[in-house]
Amino acid sequence: MARITVEDCLQQIPNRFLLVMVAAKRTKQLYKGGQPLIENKSNNKRVVHCLREIAAGKVDYEIPARKA
């Protein structure tokens, strides 16, 4: 399988900083036993698997409203 790049993920989440936050949270979910959203055919590490999920458009995120 081809290498995953930040540019692949930025097509789904256009802000680099938000991408890092979403990827970190999703990776923690996988480490705590969360179910993978795509098949891990290459037996990648959880961080790489998380980035593949984001690039595939399988990870949803929501920006919380600011408190006034």
Swiss-Prot record:
Classification lineage: Bacteria, Pseudomonadati, Thermodesulfobacteriota, Desulfuromonadia, Desulfuromonadales
Keyword Transcription appears in the UniProt entry: yes
The protein's name: DNA-directed RNA polymerase subunit omega
Enzyme Commission number: 2.7.7.6
SUPFAM superfamilies: RPB6/omega subunit-like (SSF63562)
Enzyme class name: transferase
Matching Gene3D superfamilies: 3.90.940.10
Gene Ontology BP, a term: DNA-templated transcription
GO MF terms held by the record: DNA binding; DNA-directed RNA polymerase activity
Pfam families per the UniProt record, alphabetical: RNA_pol_Rpb6
